[in-house]
Amino acid sequence: NINFLKDLKKILPNFDITIVSSVWENQDELENFKEKYNVKFINILKEKDWTNYISKVKYVTWEENSGFKVPNIFHMWHSILENIKFLEKLNNEKKEIFDFVLRFRTDIICKKGLKFLESEINSLKDNEILFPSNLHWKGLNDSFFITNFSTILGFKDFFTFLDEFIKDNRVFNPEYILYSFISEKNLKIRLINEFDLALIRVEDSKPTKTVFIPFKDKIKMKFAKQKIKLLKFQNKLKQVIK
């Protein structure tokens, strides 16, 4: 959805936006993608075999295979982490300066709230991450987030965390995994005021693994949901006080 990127550029005229992407070596219409999004730096990846990791996933939430697919979560985070390493390489070798890093999927649209984005980014501090104000059901949605360059480098050990997460038979849900990782890293979660997104996709499939949420994960998910509600309330309160 190129319109979302165009909207971002319009609302952030004071930012020099550089598109850096890591894509699969067998990616369809790669040249079209590069031209459409004006990709400045591109990193070609080989797809990894995650079969061994996937076989160890014991529990999932009911959204599995419809809202998310287990193999795709591994592929997604592999590409995100490789892109982070690529950013670091560009910074070290080409002296490219990245003040902030925005991760976003190309199948999202903004429903409202873009007007608050610039001020939220400008007030972003170390160890803080900005998320949209909606689409958080079991933790934190991973389709869009912003942090500064030094903070994103701390994500490089994500798979070490995920390996322990799976060994501990935690429930596998991408939102809950991201929330748990950020909690373990002691990063501060911030919601962009009234910044609502929507995903352009429709799927309807049954889960492939056991749908079950261990008690400790239920508690943490409820805590995450209440935390999101509190952050939304705090944003509204700030607007009233202004």
Regions from the PLM with identified roles:
Residues 2-15:
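Short, acidic, metal-binding catalytic loop of nucleotide-sugar glycosyltransferases
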Residues 22-93:
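Active-site-proximal specificity loops/subdomain of glycosyltransferases
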Residues 23-25, 102-108, 135, 151:
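Short, flexible loop/turn elements at secondary-structure junctions
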Residues 80-130:
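GT-A fold catalytic core of metal-dependent nucleotide-sugar glycosyltransferases
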Residues 241-242:
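Terminal low-complexity segments of carbohydrate-biosynthetic enzymes
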